[in-house]
Every structure is written in structure tokens, then in C-alpha cells.
């Protein structure tokens, strides 16, 4: 589980500092591996070797979207669904994170 504390300025001009959570379970990683031609690692190696910005941008979005969720109040569940993802993607935090990953190799590698 990756917890990212991000400070953003929302669309109303209010500065907000909030925690955002990202996690891929072993099952989700396995599914990505098995449903990617040649495997996930080979695909990442191919994209980085070709320095394909288009494919890299698609990969960042896929990873963000598959890993974002919210913790249940009791901490037992990590909730990921279309509504949770749509809510996050409509924030400035999503925009800032995507931009940072797409434009900063070190940030992308750390994520």
C-alpha cells in the first residue's frame, strides 16, 4: 500500500492537503501479468527501451486507475470501484500526480 500525501489547489482555489492510497494486490498484479502479451515486465522493458511516450502515458494511467482506492473506516477493506475512481480522477490531485509521473522519471520509478 502506497500512501501519498499531496497538497493541491482545488478548482475553487482552496489549498488542500490530503492522503491518497494506491495498492495492487498480488491477484491484480498476476492478472496484469497474465493478460499482457509477453508479460508485464517485458512490456515495461519494451516501452522504456523504445522511449515511447504514448505507451508510457497509457501505462501510468492504467497503473494509477487500477491501484487507486479508499480505505474502509475500519481499515479492513481497500475499496476500488468506478465511483471511487471517477471521484479521484475529477480532482486536481489526479491531474498533478499524472503530470508528475509522466514528466519525471524518478517520480515514476518511485511510484
Question: Which stretches of residues belong to each language-model region?
Answer:
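Short, charged/polar N-terminal "headpieces" of proteins
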Residues: 1-42
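Intrinsically disordered, low-complexity boundary segments flanking structured domains
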Residues: 5-10, 51-54, 84
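Homeobox/homeodomain signature
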Residues: 12-14, 37, 58, 78-79, ...
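Acidic, aromatic-enriched beta-alpha/helix-loop junctions
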Residues: 28-62
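Generic structural signal for hydrophobic core residues of well-folded globular domains
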Residues: 47, 67-68, 101
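Short, structured surface segments that line ligand/substrate-binding pockets
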Residues: 53, 58-78
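C-terminal charged interaction modules
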Residues: 72-111
